[in-house]
Amino acid sequence: MNTFWPRVGAVLACLAWLAGAPLAAEAQAAPPAGDETLRPVPAASHDPAEHTLLVMLRLPATHFRPDASYGGRYIDDSGRASRRRRAEELARQHGLTLVDDWPMPVLGLDCYVMRYPDQESPERIIANLARDPQVEWAQPVASFDGMASAPPAPATEGDALYPVQPAGRYWHVAELHRETTGRDIKVAVIDSGIDASHPDLSGQLAVNANFVDGGATPAENHGTAVAGIIAARAGNGGIVGVAPQAKLMGLRACWQQPDLATRCNSFTLGKAINYAILNGAQVINLSLAGPPDRLLDRLLDVALERGIGVVGAIDAKAAGPAFPANHRGVLAVASQPAGGKAAPAAGAEADPALLAPGNDIPTTAPGGRWSFVSGSSYAAAHVSGMLALMAQLQPKATPAQLRRLLQPGDALNTVNIDACATISRLLHHCSCSCTANLTQRGVGP
């Protein structure tokens, strides 16, 4: 245990009387009536069995235009049924079984999960599908993991935890909140389920949708912790999010495993990113990592082209680059190590990783509780909250411009984020204690 805990102990001791306090539970955020975009079609399985592929087909309805007036009907119109029948026929022709499907209107494609026989070679099937004129491409279903370094450690219920929040002590967010709170900025948290009834998260979720199995969204550790760091409510006795007035889009694309680890796959993540793009997300948080993935690659390209800030987590101890943090244009974030060591490389073509607090972070936990968490997942959440603060002040800034503000090339420290200096550069005056050159690296081209 590191030296952080003795400091925490003093604070938690004065909070012990809160341990038995009843917590008011509120209903999980419900989608507005009539909005089919918030009611995902249940998947056959959120964790596809082995021997499955994703097959992307050029099967849009005759009236469909990818960027025109998509209002949610595309997922359940009569054209979808006819497209699925054609996909079933294609599957039979190639000896496959259709398992699930989802429209990807931002790409102008339909995505199908197809299972192949145990004895078949996926490489051979993918090669055969590539020769079919209906097929845009086919790929394996990849797995992704949340970037938490250890299971959460419980904390006493207690903005009394604010004094031990790194965002409070080092980023001075209480001072920054006099200038910006991320008001009404939509932040898509693509993760495991978020506890929408938690007292620090009640009313913070504009959307709470389940792209894993289509059922009610369960309260899970990783997603709840990430959501709290980004946008926990201020002034109600728990923690304070970096952007407490941001509007969270809770998009469950990952699920909690028995060992409390977090797992996602290409299909569930693709559905959630597609939704975030279509429904006005201004920031997308991806506190996860896995292998390169063509579907997610294409979707991230669209998100970045539309000016959405995308944040990915990277493990500083990993042997190689991790996707999606190494996708060009994504803000790669690692946990801030002791001693201010150099940032890890996110990949050959990516920018150096940003460093943000990611060790012993107090945050929200399911069941109206709080816990301490560590890992680059939570460092990424800090940066997503920071982007929300910046977006309120400069809503038209591009992701590249925001990155230059976070990590100006002429700064003495090009590794650790200086939150006060960043906001001060946007405002052209000091927002809190800072010595930054406020005229350099602004929101210019």
Language-model segments: which ranges?
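Primarily auto-inhibitory N-terminal propeptides
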Residues: A25-A153
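Hydrolase catalytic cores
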Residues: I229-I230, L251-A253, Q282, G358-T422
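Bacterial N-terminal signal peptides
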Residues: G9-A21
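C-terminal subdomain of the subtilisin-like protease fold in secreted/lumenal serine endopeptidases
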Residues: I277-L288, R294, L299, R306, ...
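Protease zymogen maturation seam
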Residues: A130-K186, P199-D200, T268, I417-P445
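Active-site core segment of subtilase-fold serine proteases
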Residues: T156-M249, C254-P258, C264, T268-Q282, ...
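Structural recognition of the beta-strand scaffold that forms the well-ordered cores
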Residues: L54-V55, V113, W137, K186-V189, ...
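Catalytic-core segments of hydrolase enzymes
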Residues: V226, L269, L278-P366, F372, ...
